[in-house]
Amino acid sequence: MQLATWNVNSLTVRLPQVLDWLAANPVDALVLQETKTTDDKFPHEAIQAAGYHVAFFGQKTYNGVALLSRSEITEVVKNIPNFEDDMARVIAGTVEGVRVIGAYFPNGQAPDSDKFVYKMRWLEALQHWLREELQQHPKLVLMGDFNITVDDRDVWDPVGLKDTIHCTVEERAHFQALIDLGTHDAYRLFEQAEKSFSWWDYREFAFRRNRGLRIDHILVSDALKSSVQACVIDKAPRKNERPSDHTPVVVTLG
C-alpha cells in the first residue's frame, strides 16, 4: 500500500500536474493541501475519472484539503472535532482498514504573532484528538504539510534560520508530542541523503540551490511501523513548469 502527501498550492492551477503524477505514480491514497477551492468548484469528476474516490473540504483562496483513494473512503471527518476553526485544514477517512488523516498545519507567520498563538492552540487540539484517534484506529497515518521542521537536518541554513517560523523550539516540541503519542516519522526510519527537503521558496532560485525545508511529513502509528518499507521525497514535480513550492512525499507499507 502506498500513501502520499502533496501541498499543491492551488488545485485549480495544479490539477493537470496532479493527474499526470497519479498516472505515473498510482498510489493507493493521496492527501492534498492548499487546494484553495470551494467544495462546489472541486474537480471531483476529473479525479474520479482517474480512478479515485475523493473526500474534500475547501474554502475560497486559502487552505483546503482532500483525500483521494483507490478504495472506498469511510468515516470521513472534517477539521478537528470540538475545536472551533473556520479554516479548512483537516480531512480524515478510513481506507482499507487504515485511518488516514491529511492536514494542512497553520503556518504561524512569526513567533511573536497572533497567528503563532493560533498555531500553538491548533497543535494542542490536534494532539488531544490524535490520542483519541489512535485508540479507535491503531493503524493510522497522519500526513500533510506540517509547517514544522523536526530538527536541523531539515533546514538548509539551521544557523541563519534558528528560532524563525517552522524552526522554533515550541513548534518542534509539539511535533515531538505527536511522536510521543505512539507515532513515527516514516522518512527518518531510513537512512536519507543530507539536505533532503520537501519545500523550496519560489524566490532566489531556492530549488536550484537546494535551499529548502523538510516540512511535509508522514507519521505512522506503532501498529504500522514494522510494515513501512520505504519513504521518499519525489522532487520531480518541483521541476515542472509552474510547480507547487512543495513536492510529494510517499510512504510504502508492506
Task: Explain the meaning of each model-derived region.
Residues 48, 76-79, 151-254:
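Metal-dependent phosphoester-hydrolase catalytic domains
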Residues 6-7, 22-40, 100, 130-152, ...:
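Active-site beta-strand/loop signature of hydrolases that rely on acidic residues for catalysis
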Residues 116-137:
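A long, amphipathic alpha-helix that forms part
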Residues 81, 106-123, 159-163:
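Surface-exposed cleft-lining segments at the edges of enzyme active sites
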Residues 1-10, 97-112, 143, 246:
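Active-site-proximal beta-strand elements of phosphoester/diester hydrolases
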Residues 39-41, 64-65, 110-112, 149-159, ...:
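Short catalytic/ligand-binding loop motif for oxyanion handling, primarily in non-cytosolic enzymes
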Residues 35-38, 42-110:
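Structured beta-strand-rich core segments of catalytic domains in phosphoester-bond hydrolases
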Residues 1-53, 60-65, 150:
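N-terminal, active-site-proximal structural segment of metallo-dependent hydrolase catalytic domains
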